[in-house]
Amino acid sequence: DCTRTYVVGGDMSKAPQDFQDAYAVLADAQAAARAAAHPGSTAADIDAITRQAISAAGWGDYFVHRTGHGIGLSTHEEPFIMEGNDLALEEGMAFSIEPGIYLEGKWGMRLEDIVVLTNDGYESLNQAPRDVR
């Protein structure tokens, strides 16, 4: 899985200001979640860090899905990166970190990367740029 957000016409400066502001929040939230991804943290910890960053900026009501899911034999499997999942994350686990902000009828955005936990953090399996194109 890999999700990036694009602006029709390719010029972020021409996107609505609320879109530009929300994308900056989304990128910061995803970066905070990636930084918190390490063995011993829980799936709920990663979700909470992501939601806190988005909610603090006023966009919390527009983040309507879990933060991520495991990548393995099934498309969606444990660890489900979501509130209430106290599963401790372990080295070698692969999962998505994919927060999104959606304003129905106006615009939506998601930023998704797959990470694999290492003994001291994570490795990102996606190499695509995270900026809006």
Which residue ranges define each predicted feature?
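Active-site neighborhoods and metal-handling regions in enzymes and metal-associated proteins
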Residues: D1-R133
